[in-house]
Amino acid sequence: MEIKTFHGGVHPAEHKELSKESPLTQLLPKGELVYMTNQHIGKPASPVVKKGDRVLAGQIIAEAGGFVSANIVSSVSGTVKAVEPRKNASGGSAMAIVVENDGEYTLAEGVGVECDTNGLTGQEILSKVQKAGIVGMGGAGFPTHVKLTVKEPEKINFVIANGAECEPYITCDDKTLDRKSVV
């Protein structure tokens, strides 16, 4: 079957002015959350919790399955309802961890603690990024620790953050960079 293409793509109106001056707001999830173990590029993470376990916000619930993989961290506290195959976004099946949110948002030990990164080595920062399961927000969910791993690190003078938001209405990256950056 021939794949049809067209020149130029689709360029909807952006409407960024509707949200760019609004305050940043935290929306707390409610009810049941489903964490897919293949939500990032690379090897899926392996569940480290089982049905009935209590989990805390910030706790690792699935460990990275290799270098190009990422930990999955619970965003809520609650009880694991199931560890089972579920349909994923691409229509296939993947292992999922289902957590019933208790609404308390109890943090795991050491989570949410401010950290002065100026006193840390590059390897210590990399370890924190890897443990946290941080991935890119693009479609691939590329593990950030992979991007930050270099053979022989040199002194870093600048950090360039890609805050480009191509979707209509979306301004959260722009606002976060503008209001939360440390210079």
Regions found by a protein language model. Name each.
Residues 45-54, 58:
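Short histidine-centered loop motifs in beta-beta connectors
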Residues 71-73:
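Small beta-strand-rich domains/subdomains or short beta-sheet motifs embedded
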Residues 107, 136, 159-175:
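Gly-rich Lys/Arg/Thr-decorated short loops/hinges at beta-loop-alpha junctions or inter-strand turns
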